[in-house]
Amino acid sequence: MSKQQAPVNKNDVVEVTIEDLTHDGAGVAKVDGYALFIPKALPGERLKAKVVKVKKGYGFGRVLNMIEASPDRVEAPCPVFNQCGGCQLQHMSYDAQLRYKQKQVQDVLERIGKITAVTVRPTIGMNEPWRYRNKAQVPVGEREGGLIAGFYQERSHRIIDMDECMIQHEENDKVIRQVKELARELGIRGYDEEKHRGTLRHVVARYGKNTGEIMVVLITRGEELPHKKTLIERIHKAIPHVKSIVQNVNPKRTNVIFGDKTKVLWGEEYIYDTIGDIKFAISARSFYQVNPEQTKVLYDQALEFANLTGSETVIDAYCGIGTISLFLAQQAKHVYGVEIVPEAISDAKRNARLNGFANVQFAVGDAEKVMPWWYAQGVRADVIVVDPPRKGCDEALLKTILNMKPDRVVYVSCNPATLARDLRVLEDGGYETKDVQPVDMFPWTTHIESVAVLELKN
């Protein structure tokens, strides 16, 4: 179908019924079989939409007026929901979000993975799905001569200046407000991305939800931080719980937030938090799950699926700072963790020592290279756990798992599409998907975490 053949043109107004939702939360309507994607519309709704873009085979629209609203529609409580790109689903009731996430996982398992024998469990949600994030990464800029800090507008690098975010912990909001106020007062310039000038690029606040400890990270374009001494004193005075104030220097013209150089300006290099009974040291650049309450739910589910009795050897691929490894070590005979990022492995070893685990061993490298080496050394894994990034497992890693033939594979996923793709590879290699459990780690967003378990067929 060419653009000329599309049954709609740009700026047309059409009356449609929303049939479904996409993976990024947009409503799907059909006009003579032509798909129209309409953000912030819900299944079952009848509405008038303006066509804003026409492409080959599909187009985009925006809601003009609602004719019949869904019973799942709610008033978004956040005043900047329609501008900010942080949340996508505040117009949808929380129960409906949980059903949507379960359906998304079920649909992609069937469509991409051709896995039809498994019924995905209902999504495990939060009792209090607000204020859950323990980390805020806030871009800083300038507008009309004044410093601003907030979050990016959806699909742009335009900063929405804000003092509060309803999914951030209140302590993080307080840090951002105080630093923004102090920087304005002291005349510290925000970063101009286009011209690559100004001082303060980002403010990062990290909060240990179970310890109350706070870290403030100031990411600057250069080494120089004007009024550094005064700024540190004032931050410490304004935020009594602060345990660490850190500067990270990022001189590059890049979208990457952190630079290579990090130095402690005041206090400790680490703050601490706990998930369950396990304590974790968190540095400025450590990867640590942003919703510790649901992380425990996710890891407890992974443990249940691993079905450990105390006699098993477990490999944790993509182990990060050792969060899942240490959970597994509570019930396994021995755990081997592998991760490509050297700093993460340093943190993992530190966390193992911190908690007194002697049955964990960590290695730096590509899992698909390290695991065959372990196998050659006589390591036989009963269970392999994978927790890959959004792109899913490396093809070579999946081959390695199939060669090692563990009894069970536990797959922790942050992307249902790559989960489905990888489960298909494992099923074709002799495994059977037994169970899939979505966990809502990021309420009010379209992000979906889930954990699946596969067992080796006879």
Swiss-Prot record:
One of its GO terms (biological process) is rRNA base methylation. S-adenosyl-L-methionine binds at residues 289, 318, 339, 387. It comes from the Bacteria. GO terms for molecular function: 4 iron, 4 sulfur cluster binding; metal ion binding; rRNA (uridine-C5-)-methyltransferase activity. The active site is at 414 (nucleophile). It comes from Halalkalibacterium halodurans (strain ATCC BAA-125 / DSM 18197 / FERM 7344 / JCM 9153 / C-125) (Bacillus halodurans). Keywords: 4Fe-4S, Iron, Iron-sulfur, Metal-binding, Methyltransferase, S-adenosyl-L-methionine, Transferase. Its EC number is 2.1.1.-. This is Uncharacterized RNA methyltransferase BH0687. The lineage of its organism: Bacteria, Bacillati, Bacillota, Bacilli, Bacillales. [4Fe-4S] cluster binds at residues 78, 84, 87, 165. InterPro entries: MeTrfase_TrmA_AS (IPR030390), MeTrfase_TrmA_CS (IPR030391), NA-bd_OB-fold (IPR012340), SAM-dependent_MTases_sf (IPR029063), TRAM_dom (IPR002792), U5_MeTrfase_fam (IPR010280). PROSITE patterns: SAM_MT_RNA_M5U, TRAM, TRMA_1, TRMA_2. Residues 5-65 form the TRAM domain.
